[in-house]
Structure formats: structure tokens, C-alpha cells
Amino acid sequence: MGEIAIRLLVTGGKATPGPPIGPALSPFKINPGKVVAEINKLTKEYEGLPVPVEIIINPETKEYKIIVGLPPTSALLMKAAGVTRGPQRTVHEWVGNVSMKDVVEIAKKKIDSMPTSSLKAAVKSVLGTARATGIKVENKDPKEVTKEVDEGKWDHIINE
């Protein structure tokens, strides 16, 4: 029998042995408390954010490894803006503001999971998510900042 992968979305630094982790591990007779402690240690940096986690289990040896993904871009933006939820209306309602440096840092973290290898394209993707999440960048609509990125205005920050 090969390895089994269990994919979960947990709250960074706050996973518990209850559902969904405990029930997912019980057929393999693996101590959920030990797994949860390790998950919490690995996700501490993203405390309070939704974090994708994959637990790879060898059912014969009961050995496992934990692979931690990155929180969604929207969650990283909301954390950087210091807000806990997005806009309540579909029309653009601004709930927060981040700096261009925050956008570039998020793009650098997420670039490996994006269909691009260009940091500039990754920054533009993060700007699109910021707009959809109701977060301004440098106190401007992210759509306006995207135009400025195309014009090269932010190259000094993107290329740092």
C-alpha cells in the first residue's frame, strides 16, 4: 500500500485535534495531538489565517510528514492591512490599505504558486486580488496602481 495524502485547511497556529484533523487521522492510528502540535508549530507564522496543509501518511509504518502551503493571497493582504474581513457589498467598498512594499512581499511569497515567473506579473496579480478584497494600495485604487506598474513607476520597489 502506498502513501496517503490528507489535504486540510487549518487556522494557522490554532489547529485542534478535533475535526477535521482527528477524524482524518483516526483510521491510521496516528496520535492527532502530536500531529496538531507539529502543524501549529509549522503554521505559527500565519497565526489566525487559513493555511492549506497536507499530511502524507505511510499506513504501514505510521510515519507521516506535513507539508504547509501558503495562505490565500486575500488573507495575506487582509493581515497586512490589519483587517479581519473584506467588504460587505459587491460595489467597491474599501476596508483597508497596504503599501506597495507589502504587495511586493506577498508577490514574492506567492510567485511559486502562480502561473508566472515574472515578479512584475505576480505583483499585478496581487494588485487584482487587493482590488477584489477591498484593499487600497498606497491609498489608491489597485487598478490605478496596476497602470503605474505598467508605466514602470514602481520598478525601484519591485526590483529591490
From Swiss-Prot:
Q: Say yes or no: keyword rRNA-binding present.
A: yes
Nucleus among the record's keywords? no
Q: Which SUPFAM superfamilies match?
A: Ribosomal L11/L12e N-terminal domain, Ribosomal protein L11, C-terminal domain
The record ties this protein, via SMART domains, to: RL11
- Name the InterPro entries on file: Ribosomal_uL11, Ribosomal_uL11_C, Ribosomal_uL11_C_sf, Ribosomal_uL11_N, Ribosomal_uL11_N_sf
Quote a single Gene Ontology cellular component term: large ribosomal subunit
Query: Keywords of this protein's UniProt record, alphabetized?
Result: Ribonucleoprotein, Ribosomal protein, RNA-binding, rRNA-binding
Instruction: From the UniProt annotation, give the residues forming the signal peptide.
Output: none
Under Pfam families, the record lists:
Ribosomal_L11, Ribosomal_L11_N
Q: Which GO terms describe its molecular function?
A: large ribosomal subunit rRNA binding; structural constituent of ribosome
- GO BP terms, alphabetized: translation
Complex formation: Part of the ribosomal stalk of the 50S ribosomal subunit. Interacts with L10 and the large rRNA to form the base of the stalk. L10 forms an elongated spine to which L12 dimers bind in a sequential fashion forming a multimeric L10(L12)X complex.
Question: What does this gene product do?
Answer: Forms part of the ribosomal stalk which helps the ribosome interact with GTP-bound translation factors.
The family this protein is said to belong to:
Belongs to the universal ribosomal protein uL11 family.
Name assigned to this protein: Large ribosomal subunit protein uL11
Q: What is the scientific name of the source organism?
A: Nanoarchaeum equitans (strain Kin4-M)
Give the lineage. Answer: Archaea, Nanobdellota, Candidatus Nanoarchaeia, Nanoarchaeales, Nanoarchaeaceae
In the UniProt record, the gene name given for this protein reads rpl11
